[in-house]
Amino acid sequence: KYLDLLAAGKASAATAMVDPGVNNDQRTFLTDDVMASATSLLVVEDVVADKNDDSDTRTVTATMQVNGERFTHAFRVTADDATMGVLDNWKIRDSLAVPVTVDGDGIGQFSVGETKASIDKASFYVEGRSFLFYPGAYNFTPVAPNEYVDTTPVSVSVLDDVRTRNNDGKSDVTFKATYNDKLEAAALEAAQTLVESCGTYPGNQGDDCSSLIRGDSVTAISIKEKPTSLDSYSFDPTSFSGSVTYTVTTGEGALFPGTRDVGLTVKVDARFDDDGVLKVTADGKPDFRVSFAF
C-alpha cells in the first residue's frame, strides 16, 4: 500500500502512513504537487517478505525502478496491535523519503515544480542544506537572484539514494551562478562613470581618483582615451579591468610641470553578500567597487 501511494504520486498520504521522522523544514518537497512535477515516478516490480513468520520484526524487500534505474530496498516492519484482536497489523519503521543535499555558489534559492526553498546554511563550515524527496526523477531549477545571472536546471534521480550529473563529492546538487553579458555591460558603465568623473577639474580631486591625476599642482585634465570594453582578470568572471589615458597639465609646485599623458587601469569588482550572492543597488544595478591601478 505504501509503495502504491508513492507510485501514484500521493506524497501526503504516504507521509501520513509512514512518518519520515524529520523537522518540517526538511519536508518542503514531500508534497503531491512536487511529485506531480516529476518526469518519472516509482515503478514497483516485486515485494517479498522474509520467512520469519513467527517474528514480531520482519524484513520486506521491494524491487523498484525510477526512470529505468532498478534498485532494491529492505524495509523493517514490526507487529502492531491487532484490529479487534484478530487482524494482524504491521508498522513500517523506515520511510522511503531520501535526503538530497543542495548547495549553491552565487545561488540562494531553487525550485522543484512550483515549490521553492532557500539554500541557507547553518554555518560557513556546513556544505549545503538537506531536503527530503520521495523516489522520482525531478528537475532542480536554480532561481536567478537577478537579471545578471543565468540558470540551468539539474536533472536529479532519487532512488534510495541520489543520482545526479554534477555530483561534486560534497553536495548531491551544487548550483553555480553563470554571469551573463549584462554584468559586463553594467561593469563598463560603472567604469566609464568613474573615468568621466575623474576626467574633469575639479572632479579629479575626488577620493576615488588616482593620486597620479589629482593634487594641488594639477591645473587641467581631460580624457584622451577611455575604455570601450573590459576584460576579466584573475580568472574571475565578476572582476573586470580596462585601460584609460588622461591628459594632465600640472603647474607650479609639480616635479615636472607641463602637459603629459597618464595611463591607468580602471578595475571593477562585483560585491557579494554573506551567502555569496551578487549584491545589487536599490535601482537593481550590480553593486561594484570601482578603483584605479597603475
Residue ranges and their predicted role:
Residues P145-T178:
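Structured interaction patches on ligand/partner-binding surfaces of diverse proteins
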Residues D50-E127, F240-F294:
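Exposed beta-sheet edge and beta->alpha loop/turn motif
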Residues N23-N24, N52, N67, N89, ...:
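Detector for Asparagine
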